[in-house]
C-alpha cells in the first residue's frame, strides 16, 4: 500500500479563463508534432521540482530531484531534497530505495500496471494514443496545455485530471495531477537532455 500511495503522490481546479481551445486542425497538427518528437526520444534526463498541494496545509510540500528515462519502459525517479528516495521501473518490476533500504515488487496487478504506464506516458508526453483519456488541447501563453480526463473507473478513484504543459519543442515542461479532492501534485522539469547516453547502472538498485 505504501508503494501505491507513493506512486499516486508521484503522479499527483481547472479554471479555463484565458485559455484558448485549439481548433480541430490545430489539435491534429499538435498531436502529430508530439508523436514525431516522441519517436526521436531514446533517453531523457532532467532535474525536477515537485510541489504537493494539500487543502488542509498552509504551505505546499516541495521536493527536488532527478529523473532518468530510457525507452521504452525504464524509468528512475531520484528524490534528493529534502530526503533521499528512489523508485525504478523496469518492465514488470518496481524497485524502491528508501534511504538505503531496498525493496522490490512485481507490477503485475491492474493498478500498478496502469500507474506504471501512466508515469512513462506522462514523462514522454505520449498520451494521445491511449484510449483511457478524453483529451482537450488549449493555448496557454507560450505553452500548449493538454487536459486529460481518465475514462477508466479505477484511475478516476485516484486522479481527476492530468494537465500536461508542452514547450515549443513539443516536450513536456510541467505536469499537474489533480486528485478527486482537488489536492494536486505539480512537477516542473528543468535542464532537460535528450538522447544522451545513460549508463545501465542508473536503473539498477
Where are these regions (language model features)?
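Gly/Pro-enriched, hydrophobic low-complexity segments
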Residues: 128-134, 139-205
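Flexible, surface-exposed loop/linker segments and immediately adjacent secondary-structure boundaries
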Residues: 104-143
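N-terminal leader/targeting segments and the immediate start of mature chains
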Residues: 18-49, 53-59, 204-205
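Positively charged n-region of N-terminal signal peptides that target proteins for export
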Residues: 1-5
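An acidic-aromatic
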Residues: 20, 66-117, 185
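Short hydrophobic/aromatic-rich beta-strand segments that constitute the beta-sheet cores
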Residues: 48, 75-79, 94-97, 146-148, ...
Amino acid at each position: 500500500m505504501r508503494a501505491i500511495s507513493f506512486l499516486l503522490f508521484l503522479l499527483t481546479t481547472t479554471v479555463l479563463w484565458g485559455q484558448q481551445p485549439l481548433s480541430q486542425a490545430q489539435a491534429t497538427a499538435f498531436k502529430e508534432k508530439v508523436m514525431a518528437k516522441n519517436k526521436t526520444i531514446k533517453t531523457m534526463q532532467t532535474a525536477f521540482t515537485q510541489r504537493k498541494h494539500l487543502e488542509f496545509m498552509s504551505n505546499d510540500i516541495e521536493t527536488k530531484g532527478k529523473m532518468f528515462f530510457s525507452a521504452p519502459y525504464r524509468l528512475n525517479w531520484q528524490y534528493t531534497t529534502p530526503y533521499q528516495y528512489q523508485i525504478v521501473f523496469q518492465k514488470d518490476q518496481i524497485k524502491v530505495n528508501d534511504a538505503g533500504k531496498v525493496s522490490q515488487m512485481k507490477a503485475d496487478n491492474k493498478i500498478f500496471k496502469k500507474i506504471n504506464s501512466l508515469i512513462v506516458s506522462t514523462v514522454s508526453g505520449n498520451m494521445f494514443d491511449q484510449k483511457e483519456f478524453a483529451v482537450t488541447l488549449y493555448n496557454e501563453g507560450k505553452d500548449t496545455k493538454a487536459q486529460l480526463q481518465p475514462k477508466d473507473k479505477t484511475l478516476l478513484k485516484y486522479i481527476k485530471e492530468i494537465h500536461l504543459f508542452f514547450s515549443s519543442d513539443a516536450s513536456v515542461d510541467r505536469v499537474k495531477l489533480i486528485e478527486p479532492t482537488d489536492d494536486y501534485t505539480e512537477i516542473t522539469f528543468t535542464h532537460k537532455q535528450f538522447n544522451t547516453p545513460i549508463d545501465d547502472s542508473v536503473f539498477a538498485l
